[in-house]
């Protein structure tokens, strides 16, 4: 199983934004939609070996974490266009209004789609037994990293990135790696990682 853990620093946690202007009104949920597209969609098929956690930390009621579980997801639920994916996120946020407190309990919204009040740190703890990698400039060249055959998890930020506090939290538990010398779009990083794992035969 491949896991991607994405921190969405400003993504709204309620449906108080316009679908006609996702970049300008949603805290860049459009970036999350593209990241999900890159995580799951191939040209003529759908990746069932992927799990994605997105922790939304924007207004008005952070945090909200949405988990997308590839083995249970139906491709018709997560269509490749941004608008369709945004509507799935909205459905999860609306369902998440019923969650109270800081519980890590998840609520299934659709087959393979779950929402919770988990923090970014909760998600990391939940995946602590995975082989954790954090995508950051200055990390080890991904081409030179020897990945295990399974249970790999990749942690990355949105356009804002991970904070210094996040990186300190991850020290000693996640290996810092990089796909190149520049800052890349989250969706592009996920695509690159997926392609690289395909190439080297990691399921």
From Swiss-Prot:
GO terms for biological process: tRNA methylation. It is an enzyme of class 2 (transferase). Disulfide bonds: none annotated. This is tRNA (pseudouridine(54)-N(1))-methyltransferase. Homodimer. The gene is trmY. S-adenosyl-L-methionine binds at residues 135, 157. Specifically catalyzes the N1-methylation of pseudouridine at position 54 (Psi54) in tRNAs.
């Amino acid at each position: 199983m491949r896991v991607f853990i994405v921190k969405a620093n400003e993504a709204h946690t309620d449906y108080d934004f316009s679908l006609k202007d996702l970049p300008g009104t949603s805290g860049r949920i459009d970036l999350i939609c593209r990241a999900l597209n890159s995580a799951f969609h191939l040209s003529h098929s759908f990746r069932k070996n992927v799990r994605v956690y997105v922790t939304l930390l924007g207004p008005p009621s952070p945090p909200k974490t949405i988990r997308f579980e590839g083995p249970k997801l139906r491709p018709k639920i997560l269509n490749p266009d941004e608008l369709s994916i945004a509507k799935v996120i909205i459905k999860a946020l609306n369902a998440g209004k019923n969650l109270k407190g800081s519980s890590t309990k998840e609520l299934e919204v659709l087959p393979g789609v779950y929402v919770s009040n988990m923090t970014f740190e909760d998600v990391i703890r939940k995946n602590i037994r995975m082989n954790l990698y954090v995508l950051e400039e200055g990390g080890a060249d991904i081409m030179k990293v020897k990945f295990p055959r399974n249970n790999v998890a990749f942690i990355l930020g949105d356009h804002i990135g991970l904070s210094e506090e996040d990186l300190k939290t991850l020290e000693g538990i996640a290996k810092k790696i990089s796909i190149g010398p520049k800052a890349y779009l989250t969706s592009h990083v996920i695509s690159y990682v997926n392609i690289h794992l395909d190439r080297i035969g990691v399921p």
